[in-house]
Amino acid sequence: VSELRENSQLVWLHDDLPDSRVGLERRALEDVETARKILHSQGYYDGTVRHHINWEAQPPEASITLRPGERYVMGPTKLRYERTGPAGEPVDKDLPESVRGIDFMENAPDTLEAFGLAKGSPAEAQTVLNAVTSVVTAMRKAGYPLAEQGKARYVIDRSTHTLEADVLIKTGPLLRMGPVLIKEENVRPADNPDAPGAPAVNEDYLNKLSPWIEGQYWNDDLLKEYRTTLQETGLFSAIDMKPARLSPEQAKAAGWTDRSLAEAG
């Protein structure tokens, strides 16, 4: 009810009466549609919404009546994975296990229960979407920085009052953390300190600040940590960091330095 009040045309425009009956009827019908969406988002797929306008009152009074019905719960969920990139090289076995990281696909869950969507829990739309987002987030911390959601199929079973989910995840390639790539633009020549542009960045210094060990499985959290570290140096007005899709040879041809993984400037 509170969510409907917050989004109700009748409530928001209470002191701004429409010029005609048609206008008030339109507002009421818009609120009916809003109420249906709210019921569905909370798992009440059989809920009904009706409106009534008392034209005898002055000014006319409109009311919305909601009958939620039985709340649906989660039925079976299924996670499927489509490899959309090369398998990638295995992690360096010489690295200590404590720093190798994780290959998500070695023990990839096949349901959404591992991501907070238990069978029998309320079938709330936002909870379902959060669970799917959590899969992608987890993959980006475990070797798959380009993972993304593919097609998803949600089925309402009215006989059992359950919601079933079948979600496809596109994995992208399995990647490891590499050295840091710095791409500088409008850099002032070292032999001309009076020239326009920014001063050159010490690549070795920035590479030493990276929190990962080269060769471990990709982890987005480490990239975020590195971004924070770079911001704290005060050397950059803005920082853009992303997984490099180029081989070292391609990176050099594109003008990147030998030490590459992130773009900063």
Spans of model-derived segments:
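Periplasmic polypeptide-binding modules associated with outer-membrane biogenesis and secretion
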Residues: 1-6, 11-265
